[in-house]
Amino acid sequence: MGDLSMAKSGRKINAANRIVAPGFIDVHTHDDRVLLAKPTMDMKISQGVTSVIVGNCGISLAPLVADNPPPPLDLIAEAGACRYSTFDQFLQEVEGAPAAVNAAFLVGHSTLRVGTMDSLDRAASLPEIKKMRSLLEEGLTAGAIGLSTGLFYKPAIMAPTEEVIEIASALKAHKARYVTHMRNESDHVIQSLDETFRIGSEARSPVIVSHHKVQGKNNFGRSVETLNHIDDHLHGHHHGIAFDVYPYVASSTVLKEDSIRLSERVLITWSKSRPDLAGRELSDIADELGCDIFSAAAQLQPAGAVYFAMAEEDVQRILSHPNAMIGSDGLPHDEHPHPRLWGTFPRVLGHYCRDLKLFSLEEAIRRMTGYSAETFGLIDRGVLKAGAFADITIFDEDTVLDRATFDKPMTPAAGIDTVMVNGSVVWEHGCATGNRPGHVLRHGGNHPN
């Protein structure tokens, strides 16, 4: 950038007739362990993603030492993966074995509960809350960018609002943020938004609603109500409100009875008791086993699933809101993952931007880059300007498109030509280069040379 008349380059990249954009930022991931297990991060760089935010939904690998962490931590942690007594220990390991992408880290509330409490089916005691707050403060001092909760899941579902407020009150001093998978995204979604706004207001912290949606046929169309509710509170919430969204009508998480009840279809993504059934419809499995879908689900546990429980009109309405960021919420350890893991960003660019003309190309890129970096405090990321980090994605606006499907969910996208992270090419000619130049994005640090 700037006057390059006297500059020499190590190589030249032909970007004629291509879009040269800041590298995309995936603001909602569960890539904590895969950064170390599969550091080339093909599922991200093939989409043009150069930075990820991990530790979402209350689930982080640290600070926790546990041989067999309980659900939902098993979404990211196999036996032995939770081996970090401090958050800084985890960050140092990632720094010592860089991935192809940059990563910023949230401290998970469920992780704090598992590491602190002797029984999880209750509210935390005052000494336990003090311990969790202290662990959060240690993580924030080490460089975490905020606290995440997954109040929809055990063990956090047992946490009253006051517990979360007390722990989250550590955020303000670090100018960190509160990120939440809310307690409910169906019939009680408005009450859950109110709880979220209260936590942010009393903790004096910005709030980010994870994967905003309305689920269940009875709630189709209620995104009008939820978005108006968010807009109404934006003006009175002095610390900021934002949300992320993925461009699909199906969600994915652990196999839960209440989620099954909301869904028109359920696709099994993994099962520890029956791994051979990953990728199958739950209804077909039930027919094969000679039982109803709930009995079949019980036989598959522990397991995960894709739930078809949203309306396309709601997805489009939420995507169109100016405060929406893009986050994949992909689960990289699933045997048969949701296609969002490989297709989220090209799907926004190709299907929703180019084909449906839901918003301009410039607006689509803003939601994936500069706005996301600003919201999460990622300094000199998400922009193309002199002196900023050289995270760059080059793509063909005419051909970019997701190719991952629910049948073949691990198919790389089309139209992503070249991806650079911190000035190093990590993806070109349809392949990962093997370069691993990613940085750990500690809160307030990582300025370019």
Where are these regions (language model features)?
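Short, ordered loop/turn segments at secondary-structure junctions
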Residues: 3-4, 57-58, 152, 182-184, ...
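Divalent-metal coordination cores built from histidine and acidic residues
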Residues: 37-145, 237-239
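Short acidic, glycine/serine/threonine-rich loops at helix termini
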Residues: 62-68, 114-120, 161, 190-194, ...
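Flexible loop/turn segments at secondary-structure boundaries
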Residues: 32-33, 59-63, 111-114, 154-158, ...
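Histidine/acidic residue-rich metal-binding segments in metalloenzymes
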Residues: 89, 123-149, 155-300, 306-325
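Histidine-rich, glycine-flanked metal-binding segment
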Residues: 1-23, 38
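Active-site microenvironment of metallo-dependent hydrolases
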Residues: 45, 258-449
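Di-metal (Zn2+ and/or Mg2+/Mn2+) metal-binding site signature of metallo-dependent hydrolases
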Residues: 19-43
